[in-house]
């Protein structure tokens, strides 16, 4: 498959991307929250449980991995990328080195990881990865994000995307405007518009083939501490409006990040977006916590009961798969408990 075919497959209707690329530090926090020791064995066991689930075939188009996981071997002797491929999904890799303080800014962040990326991409391709991910983060305050932050991160995302395509892989472009703060939904709309528009300007300058990319943006949401809450209908309307205004038509689709949304909110909001989608874009998900949280809690209580954990994960994956086609509803959600 060439990169355009892979990108289309990644955003296919009925499926979405499992973000299992948490760094060791992030996994430590997640496992600690459920009273499980964070060691290589436990990290692998939990992830392997998800990657072997039945829903991988019909609901998961791709899996984003952390460097450690890409190099691991499953209990059946297959490498993790081989296990994912056997499950009917595409293996991918997170390639950024995290967000650091942007010099000359008011504590804003710039993502690092461009040094040596060309060589790393060659190795990741040999290890079986066929797409990559790079995340840029922007926080909203009275002054931020600054022009410096927006431009610096867009430039880094574009350089990354060009290097990934050079290695015959699909870049996921992830500009995340964080939910933290008391900003309104309109403020989120304005900032996200500026951020996405700048990203596509830089991608054009760097001659990136947009048909071989996937956008992973935030939904348009009010800040976590905003007093004015928004309905799923309003979130969907503003999100669609923002993307129609700023996304070039060549991009095959969008895989939304879940940000700080709960599992149900992330599913419901995606469903609403697809209900009113009047574009040629496919709107799907690239969720981490919003796909894994319930499964993680179940696994922590009964690590040996793999089928039980997989059942919980399969339900979440099916619900999100349904929401990519606007087929999710409360009754379907409750069917799992029945």
What kind of region is each of these model predictions?
Residues 63, 132, 171-172, 213, ...:
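Hydrophobic residues within beta-strands of alpha/beta enzymes
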Residues 179, 183-250:
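Catalytic core of soluble alpha/beta enzymes
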Residues 97, 138, 177, 219-221:
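Short, histidine-centered active-site or binding-site loop motifs used for metal coordination
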Residues 67, 136, 217:
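Residues that line or immediately flank small-molecule/substrate-binding pockets and catalytic motifs
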Residues 1-127, 140, 149, 228, ...:
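Alpha/beta catalytic barrel-like cores
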Residues 90, 170, 212-214, 253:
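Proline-centered loop/turn at the N-terminus of a beta-strand
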Residues 39, 134, 173, 215, ...:
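Conserved, mostly hydrophobic/aromatic
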